[in-house]
C-alpha cells in the first residue's frame, strides 16, 4: 500500500476508485453525484474489524490497508485530524458518529466491542430485531437524523431490517463550513452551464474578484476554496497568522503554511466534455493515494473571471454491486463470508454472519456563504440459518394431537385443562 505517514492515503485511493465506479453510473444516467468516502470507509472498516480470512483480505485491499492494525491507525488519524470539529474556535463544524446495533440475543465479542468503542468511537446497543424490526429500524434512522442535523432523515429503507437481521453497522457525518472569502451575493449572476451532451442550462453563478488558489495542470485546472478557520497572531514571527488548533497546527507542520484546515477543491477539465476522462485519470494514477495532494494549488493568483455555480446534490443507493465490482465479494457470499470476529457463539447457533446490504446516502449544498453536507452509511448483517432459542412452557391449558406425519392421520386429539385430573 502506498501511503505516507500522517496522510489518509488509503482513504484517498479508495475515494478516487469509488468515484470512478459511481461516476460511470452517474454519467450514463446523466445524474449528479455526491458521496462520502470518509463515511463509507469508516463503516466498511467496522465490518473489517470483525472479518477474518479472505473476507478480511478483500476489505483490506479495498481500503488500502496492509493489516487491521494499519487500518485502525488510518481511521484513528482520520477521526483525530481529518474529522476534527473546530466550531468552538470559529472553524467548520464537523461531527462523525459510528454505531453498532446487535440483536439482543447476540453478544458482541469483547475484542470487537473494544475496537468499535476505542478506534471507531462507536456506540454499541442491543436491539430487538427479531420481534420488533420496524421499531428498531426507526430508532436507527432517528439516530442518523440527529447525527446529521436532519439532513439524512433515513438511511435504512422499509424492509431492510427484518427478523433475520443480526447486526447493523452505521456511520454518520455532518459538515458545515463558511468560506474564508465568501462570494458576494450581489455578484451572483445567471449564466450558461454546458452539459456533457452539449446542451446547456441557465444556472446562478457565484463570482469573486479576490485572488484565488488556482493550479494549472495537463488537461485540467484546480481551484481551492478554503473554509474559514480561526487564526491567531504568531508573536514569534512578526504577525503571520497560524491556526489556533493543536490538530491543524500538526497539519501545518507537516504540509506547510498554505495547506491548513478544510478546503473544497474543484477539478475543472479543459474540455467541456472532459470530466469522464479526468475521473479515469485520477482513478488510474499509479500514485492515486497522493493524487489530490500532488495537485493542490500552492499559491494565490490574480483572477479575471471566476465563476462557480451554486448547487445542491443528493445521492441514495444500495451499493452492494459497486463494492463487489471493486473486489469485495466474500462478505456478501453466504458460502464464503467469515465475520466470525463480531459475535459470540455464531457457529453454534446454526450459521455464520454475512453482509446483506450496504446503503449510502449523501447530500451537499454549496452557496455564497459556504457548504453544508451530510452522509450516512449502513451495513446490515444477517445470521445464516437464523435459529434463536425459544421458550415453550406449557403451564396453562393446551390442545394436543397425535398425528401420522406422512398421511396426516390424526390418531388422538384432546386438550388438557388440569394435568392433575384424569377426567374419566
UniProtKB/Swiss-Prot annotation:
| Keywords from the UniProt entry | Protease inhibitor, Serine protease inhibitor
Q: Where is this site: Reactive bond?
A: 384-385
Recorded superkingdom: Eukaryota
The record's Gene3D superfamilies line, in alphabetical order, gives: Alpha-1-antitrypsin, domain 1, Antithrombin, subunit I, domain 2
Please list every transmembrane segment annotated in the UniProt record, as residue ranges.
none
Q: Write down any Gene Ontology CC term.
A: extracellular space
Q: Does the keyword Glycoprotein apply?
A: no
Q: Which residues form a coiled coil?
A: none
- Extract the ranges annotated as region (RCL): 370-394
Q: Which Pfam families match?
A: Serpin
Q: Name one GO molecular function term.
A: serine-type endopeptidase inhibitor activity
Family designation: Belongs to the serpin family.
Q: What does the function comment of this entry state?
A: Probable serine protease inhibitor.
- Free-text comment about domains: The reactive center loop (RCL) extends out from the body of the protein and directs binding to the target protease. The protease cleaves the serpin at the reactive site within the RCL, establishing a covalent linkage between the carboxyl group of the serpin reactive site and the serine hydroxyl of the protease. The resulting inactive serpin-protease complex is highly stable.
This protein is called what? Serpin-Z2A
Amino acid at each position: 500500500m502506498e501511503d505516507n505517514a500522517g496522510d489518509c492515503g488509503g482513504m484517498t485511493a479508495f475515494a478516487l476508485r469509488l468515484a470512478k465506479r459511481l461516476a460511470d453510473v452517474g454519467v450514463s444516467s446523466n445524474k449528479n453525484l455526491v458521496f462520502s468516502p470518509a463515511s463509507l470507509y469508516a463503516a466498511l472498516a467496522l465490518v473489517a474489524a470483525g472479518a477474518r480470512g479472505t473476507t478480511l483480505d478483500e476489505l483490506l485491499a479495498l481500503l488500502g490497508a496492509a493489516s487491521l492494525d494499519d487500518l485502525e491507525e488510518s481511521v484513528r488519524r482520520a477521526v483525530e485530524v481529518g474529522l476534527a470539529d473546530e466550531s468552538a474556535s470559529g472553524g467548520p463544524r464537523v461531527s462523525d458518529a459510528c454505531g453498532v446495533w446487535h440483536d439482543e440475543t447476540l453478544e458482541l465479542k469483547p475484542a470487537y466491542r473494544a475496537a468499535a468503542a476505542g478506534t471507531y468511537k462507536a456506540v454499541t446497543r442491543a436491539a430487538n430485531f427479531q420481534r420488533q424490526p420496524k421499531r428498531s429500524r426507526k430508532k436507527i434512522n432517528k439516530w442518523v437524523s440527529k447525527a446529521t442535523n436532519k439532513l439524512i432523515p433515513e438511511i435504512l429503507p422499509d424492509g431492510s431490517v427484518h427478523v433475520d437481521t443480526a447486526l447493523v453497522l452505521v456511520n454518520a457525518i455532518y459538515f458545515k463550513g463558511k468560506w474564508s472569502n465568501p462570494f458576494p451575493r450581489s455578484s451572483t449572476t445567471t449564466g450558461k452551464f454546458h452539459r456533457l451532451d452539449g446542451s446547456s442550462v441557465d444556472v446562478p453563478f457565484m463570482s469573486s474578484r479576490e485572488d484565488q488558489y488556482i493550479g494549472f495542470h495537463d488537461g485540467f485546472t484546480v481551484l481551492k476554496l478554503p473554509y474559514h478557520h480561526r487564526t491567531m497572531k504568531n508573536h514569534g514571527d512578526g504577525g503571520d497568522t497560524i491556526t489556533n488548533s493543536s490538530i491543524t497546527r500538526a497539519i501545518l507542520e507537516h504540509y506547510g503554511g498554505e495547506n491548513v484546515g478544510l478546503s473544497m477543491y474543484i477539478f475543472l477539465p479543459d474540455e467541456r466534455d472532459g470530466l469522464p476522462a479526468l475521473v479515469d485519470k485520477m482513478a488510474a494514477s499509479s500514485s492515486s493515494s497522493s493524487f489530490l495532494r500532488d495537485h493542490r494549488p500552492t499559491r494565490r493568483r490574480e483572477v479575471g473571471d471566476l465563476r462557480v455555480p451554486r448547487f445542491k446534490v443528493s445521492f441514495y443507493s444500495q451499493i452492494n454491486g459497486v463494492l463487489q465490482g471493486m473486489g469485495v465479494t466474500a462478505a456478501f457470499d453466504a458460502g464464503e463470508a467469515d465475520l466470525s470476529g463480531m459475535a459470540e457463539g455464531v457457529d453454534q447457533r446454526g450459521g455464520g454472519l454475512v453482509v446483506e446490504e450496504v446503503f449510502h446516502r449523501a447530500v451537499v449544498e454549496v452557496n455564497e456563504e459556504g457548504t453544508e453536507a451530510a452522509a450516512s452509511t449502513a451495513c446490515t448483517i444477517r445470521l445464516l440459518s437464523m435459529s434463536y432459542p425459544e421458550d415453550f412452557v406449557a403451564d396453562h391449558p393446551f390442545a394436543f394431537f397425535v398425528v401420522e406425519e406422512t398421511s396426516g392421520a390424526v390418531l388422538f386429539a384432546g386438550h388438557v385443562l388440569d394435568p392433575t385430573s384424569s377426567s374419566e
